[in-house]
C-alpha cells in the first residue's frame, strides 16, 4: 500500500493530516492520533499503518482525521 496523500479528495474530506499535533480543527483534542484510534488496523505499526477509513492506503501513526475514534 502507498501512503495517503494529504491533498487527495478522501483525505481532504476527513481533514486528514500526517502530523496530528499541527491540526487546527474543532473536533481535534490533544493526544488524538492514528495509532491510538480504533480504525488504525495495526497498532504495532509505529510509523505508517493501515486504516479502515482509507482502504489500501497507509496513514501516519501520528496523523489525525475527523473519523477518529478512541481505542479501548
Curated annotation (Swiss-Prot):
GO MF annotation, one: 4 iron, 4 sulfur cluster binding
Record PROSITE patterns: HIPIP
Protein's UniProt keywords contain Iron-sulfur: yes
Signal peptide: none
Record GO biological process: aerobic electron transport chain
Keyword NAD (UniProt): no
Binding site for [4Fe-4S] cluster: 34, 37, 51, 65
Keywords of the record: 4Fe-4S, Electron transport, Iron, Iron-sulfur, Metal-binding, Transport
InterPro entries, sorted: High_potential_FeS_prot, HIPIP_sf
Family note: Belongs to the high-potential iron-sulfur protein (HiPIP) family.
Subunit and partners: Homodimer.
Function: Specific class of high-redox-potential 4Fe-4S ferredoxins. Functions in anaerobic electron transport in most purple and in some other photosynthetic bacteria and in at least one genus (Paracoccus) of halophilic, denitrifying bacteria.
Protein name: High-potential iron-sulfur protein isozyme 1
Amino acid at each position: 500500500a502507498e501512503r495517503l496523500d494529504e491533498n487527495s479528495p478522501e483525505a481532504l474530506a476527513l481533514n486528514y493530516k500526517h502530523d496530528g499535533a499541527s491540526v487546527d480543527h474543532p473536533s481535534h483534542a490533544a493526544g488524538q492520533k492514528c495509532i491510538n484510534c480504533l480504525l488504525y488496523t495495526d497498532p504495532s505499526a509505529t510509523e505508517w499503518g493501515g486504516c479502515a477509513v482509507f482502504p489500501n492506503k497507509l496513514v501516519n501513526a501520528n496523523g489525525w482525521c475527523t473519523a477518529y475514534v478512541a481505542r479501548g
